[in-house]
Amino acid sequence: ISSQEKSIQNMTRALPECKACINNPREIRCYTNENHRIISEMFREMKSACTDNSIDCNFMREMIPHHRGAVRMSENALRFCLCPELVPLLNEIIVSQKKGIKEMECLLKKLDC
C-alpha cells in the first residue's frame, strides 16, 4: 500500500510535465487497442479463478491476474513516447506488482490453496 501511495504522489507531481506530451492518433489507437485486450484478459482471468471455501485463497487467486494486468498495462504504455516523469513510475509499478505476484503465489503454496 505504501508503494501505491508513493506512486500516486509521484504521478501528481508529474502531471504538469506530462500534460505537454502529445501522442499521434496511430499511437493512441495502438495503445488503446492493446490496453483493451489486456483489461479484457485480466477480467477473464479474474472471473475464471478457481474458488473454494477459503476467502484468503480466493482473494489471492483473483488478485494475481489483477497484478499481472497492471504489469502488462505498464509495459504497454512504455512502448510509446511518454512524459519522462512517468517512466520511473511505470517501472515502479512493474517491480512492485511482480513482487506482489510472487508473494501471493508463495502464500498460496503455504496455505495449500
Question: Which sequence ranges carry the predicted segments?
Answer:
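His/Met- and acidic-residue-enriched segments that coordinate or traffic transition-metal cofactors
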Residues: I1-C113
